Amino acid sequence: VLADPEVEAVSVCTPNNVHPTISIDALRAGKNVLCEKPAARTYKEALEMQKVQHETGKVLNIGVVNRFNDSVNLIKKYIDDGKLGNIYHVHASFRAHRSIPGLGGAFTTKAIAGGGALIDWGVHYLDIVMYCCGDPKVKTVTGEAFCELGKDMKGYAYTDMWAGPPKYDGTYDVDDSVVGMIRTEGPVISLHGAWAQNIGENECYIDFMGDKGGIRLQYGKDFTVYSSEYGALTEYKPVFKMRDHFQNEIDAFIDCIKTGKKLPSHIDTVIITAQMMQAIYDSSEQHKEITLG
């Protein structure tokens, strides 16, 4: 594939541990790359991918598909137009009752995946927050990652398992739950995520809280706007056409190759998410707040 001059673009949809190698090899072979999220297992690996992109000048976009989600882009317009006022706090919840994927397999092996709930699900939520809030500069990060419910693999009770079935002779050494707080030059961002928890309800949403209004986005669905007007509280759901955001992403990738237009999913834009996730893991391991320069 890399030696074929007719191949202009490569889509990398492999396990996380080979994202950097394949993407870098493709870039150096003169191919444009759309690499699935997360960019890599670590911030260091993501930086190496970015370095090679700069050297080659080819496209390197990361599969943060929500940047092509019509619901997310409408929320961004609300915020950019000042409809919510000053956004002072954003909270992301990505918690499931029992949703550890492929217990004992690639998803739960740190050497392959790089992490668990944070790097698999949290990457989407953090990316949405940063995108909608205008990519504010990050100052400090604190967090804690837990490996609790899945470590006793044979004792882990579940009703369904995506990417299954379980491999009880495999490895489980990643986070199944995570909490964090990120201070930026814009809003404070808090997060609580879990592949698995001993609470029955799934809670997958993002709350944007401003001094003029607020928005709750139900992940993958629509959103509700909360505000006040003429002394009365208001609450409404915008109605709009939702296109397939995966198709939007692919169409935009092809278009940027043709036009040279830099997309919101370019490695330069989204690498901050890799840095934040790395800082949460570092904070958890070192039991201290991490300052980002």
Functional labels for PLM-detected ranges:
Residues L34, V59-N61, H91, T142, ...:
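Structural detector of well-ordered beta-strand residues that form the stable sheet scaffold
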